[in-house]
Structure formats: C-alpha cells, structure tokens
Swiss-Prot record:
<feature type="modified residue" description="Phosphoserine; in alleles A and C">
    <location>
        <position position="83"/>
    </location>
</feature>
<feature type="modified residue" description="Phosphoserine">
    <location>
        <position position="130"/>
    </location>
</feature>
<dbReference type="GO" id="GO:0032570">
    <property type="term" value="P:response to progesterone"/>
</dbReference>
<dbReference type="GO" id="GO:0005615">
    <property type="term" value="C:extracellular space"/>
</dbReference>
<feature type="modified residue" description="Phosphoserine">
    <location>
        <position position="82"/>
    </location>
</feature>
<dbReference type="Pfam" id="PF00363">
    <property type="entry name" value="Casein"/>
</dbReference>
<keyword id="KW-0964">Secreted</keyword>
<feature type="signal peptide">
    <location>
        <begin position="1"/>
        <end position="15"/>
    </location>
</feature>
<dbReference type="GO" id="GO:0032355">
    <property type="term" value="P:response to estradiol"/>
</dbReference>
<feature type="modified residue" description="Phosphoserine; in allele A">
    <location>
        <position position="27"/>
    </location>
</feature>
<feature type="modified residue" description="Phosphoserine; in alleles A and C">
    <location>
        <position position="79"/>
    </location>
</feature>
<feature type="modified residue" description="Phosphoserine; in allele C">
    <location>
        <position position="56"/>
    </location>
</feature>
<dbReference type="InterPro" id="IPR001588">
    <property type="entry name" value="Casein"/>
</dbReference>
<feature type="modified residue" description="Phosphoserine; in alleles A and C">
    <location>
        <position position="81"/>
    </location>
</feature>
<feature type="modified residue" description="Phosphoserine">
    <location>
        <position position="90"/>
    </location>
</feature>
<feature type="modified residue" description="Phosphoserine">
    <location>
        <position position="61"/>
    </location>
</feature>
<dbReference type="InterPro" id="IPR031305">
    <property type="entry name" value="Casein_CS"/>
</dbReference>
C-alpha cells in the first residue's frame, strides 16, 4: 500500500507543467475584456433600436385603432340619441298639422251657423265674421286660408257653442222651426178674448134641417 501511494505522488509531480500559467502575465485590461465577453451575456437583438422603433410603431397603431373604435361607438351613440330626439319632433309636427286641418264636424257646424243666420235668428248675430270668411275660403279651396290654424276661430266660437247647439240640432231637424224664433224687438199682442169673437151668421132654416133616414 505504501508503495502504491508513493508511485501516485511521483506520477502527479512528473505530470505537473514546468512553465507558469499564461494568464498570470496578462494585463488587467485584457482580463476585464475577457470577463465582459464570456461572463456578461450579449445584448439581445430584440432590444436594438430598429426593433424598438418597430415596437413603438405597433403600439402606436394599436392605440390609434382603439381610439378610432371608441370614436365610432360615440358617433353611433350620438346618432341614436339624435334619432330618438327627431322622432318626437315629427310626432309633434303631425299633431300640429292635425290640429290645423279643420275637421268635417267643424265645417258642418259652420254651415249650420251660416244657414241659420239667414233666418235672422237673433242669437246668431254674435257669430264672428272670421268664421264665415274662413268657411267660404275652405269651400273655394284657397290654400292660404287652409294653412291658417283654426285655434283663433275656435276661441271666438267657444263662448256660445254650449248654448246654441241644442237649438241648432232642433232647427236642423225642423228647418221651419227657425221661424218661431221672433226678433227681440217685436212686441207681443194680447190674444183676443172670447167676447170679441163675432158669432157666426147662419140662415134661419139651418136649425130645421131634417136628416134623411136610411
């Protein structure tokens, strides 16, 4: 055993090189460069200036697309809200047009008023002239008068409608009944008494007439 140990030690001593290590004579600068090359990892290609510019462009384009999508959504929301506002406005215009256009019932009332006015009914003296003119213009088909609103005439005729239309329906059913409404200026005379009525004059033989028997 002792012989084996001695032979191993001699072999190791013989195998050791006689010259010193080369890097012992190198300067410190060369050692630092070698350390930087082998120890420090090289800068990756992803982080070069060109790649950084491309990445920044991609990020900018994505942000622009996102902003465009948001603007489009805002425009759609604004158009929907504006369309909702336009719908009630059109409905209001239709309602106003319906109010402006005279109905057949209203024209019938005006015709009754003008027809009864010819009978010199005293209650119909308060009928405004604007209603008569408007009725004539509607019959003639004058568009200027048809476009005018009917609100003013309705206000003028509103204060005597409830009192007169009960009589108008009766007079319409019986046209001759309009003559029974006498003017306010007429004076009523008392009816003659029975004593003033003259007795009928007959022949003397009128009481002696005999009826034939059948």
């Amino acid at each position: 055993m002792k012989l084996l140990i001695l032979t191993c030690l001699v072999a190791v001593a013989l195998a050791r090189p006689k010259h010193p290590i080369k890097h012992q004579g190198l300067s410190s600068e060369v050692l630092n460069e070698n350390l930087l090359r082998f120890v420090v990892a090289p800068f990756p290609e992803v982080f070069r200036k060109e790649n950084i510019n491309e990445l920044s462009k991609d990020i900018g384009s994505e942000s622009i697309e996102d902003q465009a999508m948001e603007d489009a959504k805002q425009m759609k929301a604004g158009s929907s809200s504006s369309s909702e506002e336009i719908v009630p406005n059109s409905a209001e215009q239709k309602y106003i047009q319906k109010e402006d256009v005279p109905s057949e019932r209203y024209l019938g009332y005006l015709e009754q008023l003008l027809r009864l006015k010819k009978y010199n009914v005293p209650q119909l003296e308060i009928v405004p002239k604007s209603a008569e003119e408007q009725l004539h213009s509607m019959k003639e088909g004058n568009p200027a008068h048809q476009k005018q609103p009917m609100i003013a005439v309705n206000q003028e005729l509103a204060y005597f409608y409830p009192q007169l239309f009960r009589q108008f329906y009766q007079l319409d059913a019986y046209p001759s009944g309009a003559w029974y409404y006498l003017p306010l200026g007429t004076q009523y005379t008392d009816a003659p008494s029975f004593s003033d009525i003259p007795n009928p004059i007959g022949s003397e033989n009128s009481g002696k007439i005999t009826m034939p028997l059948w």
